[in-house]
Amino acid sequence: MAREATIARTTNETSIQLSFSLDGEGKAELETGVPFLTHMLDLFAKHGQFDLRVDAKGDTHIDDHHTTEDIGICLGQAIKEALGDKKGIKRYGNAFVPMDDALAQVVIDLSNRPHFEFRGEFPAAKVGTFDVELVYEFLWKLALEARMNLHVIVHYGRNTHHMIEAVFKALGRALDEATMVDPRVKGVPSTKGML
């Protein structure tokens, strides 16, 4: 069975169509209206070997907040749906990724208990026109809607772009690891018998 999902979300602020495949080739077709987010999602898909298509229209004439947040919501919902019953998955993923001066770590538990922790400080408030605080908003909504426990640690860095890039690459790699099917796992990887 294909591990993929398509999500549509329309509000007074945004209209989003998103398709996601866990077992992809790292291909991304992205029209987000938020150039820096487009760049980060492209990295996420490439390094996680996911196929991701996003067609988003939002009130970016105000700012990028609603569009960024709502794409995070849709991607989280797509991840949850694509995982199905989670039988046979590894469940946990951990990735360290360096990007020049920056080092980021992302740790994931696909536990069905949403939680988000972020440690790190970005030296700049903006990358181009993108408000850096939206990285937190995107990741928190992603974790909430995917019902994952997501820990993001930016260990160090000087360049904000590099630091965020390391986070999104690590996110892709950690999610890829957590969603891999392990033939040794019988049923769901939990002593509770469900996730």
UniProtKB/Swiss-Prot annotation:
GO terms for cellular component: cytoplasm. Its EC number is 4.2.1.19. One of its GO terms (molecular function) is imidazoleglycerol-phosphate dehydratase activity. It is found in: Cytoplasm. Keywords: Amino-acid biosynthesis, Cytoplasm, Histidine biosynthesis, Lyase. One of its GO terms (biological process) is L-histidine biosynthetic process. Pathway: Amino-acid biosynthesis; L-histidine biosynthesis; L-histidine from 5-phospho-alpha-D-ribose 1-diphosphate: step 6/9. It catalyses: D-erythro-1-(imidazol-4-yl)glycerol 3-phosphate = 3-(imidazol-4-yl)-2-oxopropyl phosphate + H2O. The keyword Cell wall biogenesis/degradation does not apply. SUPFAM superfamilies: Ribosomal protein S5 domain 2-like. Belongs to the imidazoleglycerol-phosphate dehydratase family. This is Imidazoleglycerol-phosphate dehydratase.
